Design a protein with these regions (language model features):
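Extracytoplasmic
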Residues: 1-38, 88
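Helix-loop-helix hairpins in multi-pass membrane proteins, especially solute transporters
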Residues: 35-166
Length: 166
């Protein structure tokens, strides 16, 4: 969603577009660093706790990204956002599979996969529209209500289910 907004972000923050690409790079690098830590974190703190912490910290980081007054602060908040987003993908699959019986796991993952296939198509379209009609900060602010709803739903469904920790 942020890729198509780089020219607007760069212009508003008074930097060159090639500097603005750090908004994307910083997220990706931080995400790649945190992803392998997911297994260790879940063994230490539990799957539900880590997933909820990831979602809520992602919401906070998204809000801060929308408020960022400079490219440097935006990049710092994107690093945080990317780092806390790492566990969300594998843990969303793990929690989903724990909800369905083994014989329905293929169906559950098929529905999950549909969202991951639709997002890269809808994201840039939505990001472009939001940036053009509302403003680039809203590509980050839009994550706040969605993330809060996801955190509430996760807590409601899984608060009694937690994996053993070491």
């Amino acid at each position: 969603i942020a890729n198509v907004s780089i020219p607007a972000i760069s212009g508003d923050l008074g930097v060159a577009p090639n500097q603005g690409t750090w908004v994307i790079t910083s997220f990706g690098v931080a995400n790649a660093i945190s992803l392998p830590l997911t297994g260790w974190l879940t063994q230490r703190f539990g799957q539900v706790r880590i997933f909820l912490a990831s979602v809520l910290l992602f919401v906070l980081a998204s809000f801060l990204c929308g408020l960022a007054p400079t490219l440097g602060t935006l990049i710092a908040f994107r690093v945080l956002q990317g780092f806390v987003a790492g566990p969300m993908i594998p843990l969303s699959q793990t929690l989903l599979l724990s909800t369905y019986p083994l014989r329905q796991s293929g169906t559950a993952l098929a529905f999950w996969s549909m969202t991951t296939l639709i997002a890269p198509v809808v994201g840039p379209l939505a990001g472009g529209w939001i940036t053009d009609n509302i403003g680039w900060p809203w590509i980050f602010f839009i994550n706040v209500p969605v993330g809060l709803i996801a955190a509430f739903a996760t807590w409601t469904l899984y608060r009694r289910r937690e994996t053993p920790t070491r």
